[in-house]
Amino acid sequence: MVKIATYHGVDPSEELARKAGIRPEDVIRLNANENPYGALDKVSAALVGQPLHLYPDPKQQKLRTALSEYVGQPVDRIIGGAGGDEIIDLLMRLFVEPGQTVLDCEPTFGMYSFAARLADAKIISAPRTNTWDIDIPAMTGAIDRLTRIIFLASPNNPTGNLLRERDARALLDTGVILCVDETYYEFSGNTLSHLLDDYENLVILRSFSKWAGIAGLRVGYAIGSATLISHLMDIKQPYNINIAGEAAVLAALEHRDELLERTRSLVEQRKKLEAVINDLDGVSYFPSQGNFLLCKFEHRTAEQAFTGLARHGIFVRQFPQTVLNDSLRISAGTPEQTDQLIYALKNIV
């Protein structure tokens, strides 16, 4: 057996509370880009009475039809997954053989490299510029005959910047499969899905975890060419979207206006945090189009800042032993959480 470095997710609130010596109800989770408002009551109500004793539809017909209306793409260009993570894994299974190459651009979402390691692929991470933009010469220079797929997030997690269309086109023109992860699309309002008509090697990945507040139900989806989606449908687990997840997505799409109002509120809280940080000495941030900010601390280490926030019950995301070891990613919260965060920041910087 081969030892694979584990991808570590976030701890539950009970574990965070134990580490901080506080009550679980006092934990403020700003470490996973979760939606602090949770699911709409109407979405939760939609789960009641579902036929949980039955297997879900392996063809995902209701789900894909509703998604088709939402994204403006034909049903045969859409597939649902048990979170975006499953679709990343399916793309690896479909395109990558052991020893072949997967390309990403660090710093970015760690699931791409984790899935590549599981596929026994070689992962190449091209460096970004000092403003976290894609370095196209570095990216294209890393592509060779063994390169099978490129993963780029837009907005990028954790830096928050967008993938420019001209950069996406430059990579797509190489002929290599490009997966653009638009998990935070509802916060940025920016998409490259209009390029799908021009490039059959483009895949758009999205999620309901962040904007819809149902991360615990694990539902994501991909948009691509009809041929590519057909192949993904062929290799997925037959019942990968559970009954509860499907019901929640259908209800979320029906009541999307209310959910999008919540996303706008979270963007406003991010902007409020930006304004406060602008006036703080010793901390700066990188402009973000997501529901989070990547903050850099100058007068103390990121570990010290993390510990200081944790003493206030606020948990954020660390990146030790990476190029971001001096930074923390802070998720947008409710107005009350933002106020507590600002108070804590002013006490630790």
Regions found by a protein language model. Give the residues of each.
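Phosphate-binding glycine-rich loop
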Residues: 56, 60-101, 299
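N-terminal "arm"/small-domain region of PLP-dependent enzymes with the aminotransferase-like
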Residues: 1-54
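Conserved PLP-binding catalytic core of the aspartate aminotransferase-like
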Residues: 266-267, 280-312, 328
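PLP-dependent aminotransferase class I/II
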Residues: 40, 201-279, 284-286
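Active-site phosphate-binding strand-loop segment of PLP-dependent enzymes
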Residues: 130-186
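PLP-dependent enzyme catalytic core of the Aspartate aminotransferase-like
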Residues: 311-312, 317, 321-349
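PLP-dependent aminotransferase-like
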Residues: 94-152
